[in-house]
Amino acid sequence: MSQPNQIHNALYLAFQRLQWAGLRESVPLTLSENDLADLRGINEKISLSEVTDIYLPLSRLLNLNVGAKQQRGLALNEFLGHVPPKRPYIISIAGSVAVGKSTTARILQALLSHWPEHPKVDLITTDGFLYPLAELKRRGLLQRKGFPESYDMKALVEFISAIKAGEATVSSPIYSHITYDRIPDEQQWIRQPDILIIEGLNVLQTGQDSPVDTQRPFVSDFVDFSIYVDANESLLKKWYIDRFLQFRTGAFSSENSYFHHYSKLGDKEATATASNIWDTINGPNLTLNILPTRERAHLILQKGPDHLMDQVLLRK
């Protein structure tokens, strides 16, 4: 980790992989190899042993936290003498491009939905709240896509606050990684889930990170439990390049893909292109905006080579 170890020692309890795996207790494995195949991201090699060692203990921890919040809600209901609208428990997952946030989110969604106390678990990504492509071009932000200023933060905060207020139905824009843009006239509908997982680059950001809007609410103000998926930048860059090369022969080959022109690149040229994108966009965004929020997370999942978790840090 790039932050001094003494900071982590002060803020977190550290668990090596085997120590963390021992906290699973009797939580059953509810995913099959076929289930896991559907949840894996591009170029990720997550196995059932990874689910057993890392994600089952985490699902147990989250279940305990959700249960504690539900009990506090019952006590408040008794005190107030009425039952307020159902408010979901909100989990955020942050981290760099290519670190595997989406896979982590999907696995947790699948595992948490098997707990009888909270069977309805929804998942959204903040990608849908990126400004439309035309608006990014108008604002001169196309080369800063993924940076905080490229998101419609007002709409994102309004969405998450409506969820937290217990509104019956709330909609979120849907993003296409093929067209590199929002899908017009399509929405994801959230209808009072027990748990909402929100995954994105900047979901740990606070007013301290915004020199302009220091007083307005941020997504992090509405989150009950936050997770940061971490890895050394050299690994992140390698994973990004590997994923780019996979997309070149996969998603980029579609004529509808915004990046279709990349599908015609040879290996050497494609590698150089991906490396340049990392060095000019994703790397600086990580350094300036994403990594500085890491120590705000309740839990840090530290990855080593091959996307395998080797350490878990739990906030004291």
UniProtKB/Swiss-Prot annotation:
ATP binds at residues 95-102. CDD domains: PanK. It is found in: Cytoplasm. GO terms for molecular function: ATP binding; pantothenate kinase activity. Its EC number is 2.7.1.33. InterPro entries: P-loop_NTPase, PanK, PRK/URK. NCBIfam families: panK_bact. GO terms for biological process: coenzyme A biosynthetic process. GO terms for cellular component: cytoplasm. This is Pantothenate kinase. It catalyses: (R)-pantothenate + ATP = (R)-4'-phosphopantothenate + ADP + H(+). The keyword Chloroplast does not apply. Disulfide bonds: none annotated. It is an enzyme of class 2 (transferase). Pathway: Cofactor biosynthesis; coenzyme A biosynthesis; CoA from (R)-pantothenate: step 1/5. Keywords: ATP-binding, Coenzyme A biosynthesis, Cytoplasm, Kinase, Nucleotide-binding, Transferase. Gene3D superfamilies: P-loop containing nucleotide triphosphate hydrolases. Belongs to the prokaryotic pantothenate kinase family.
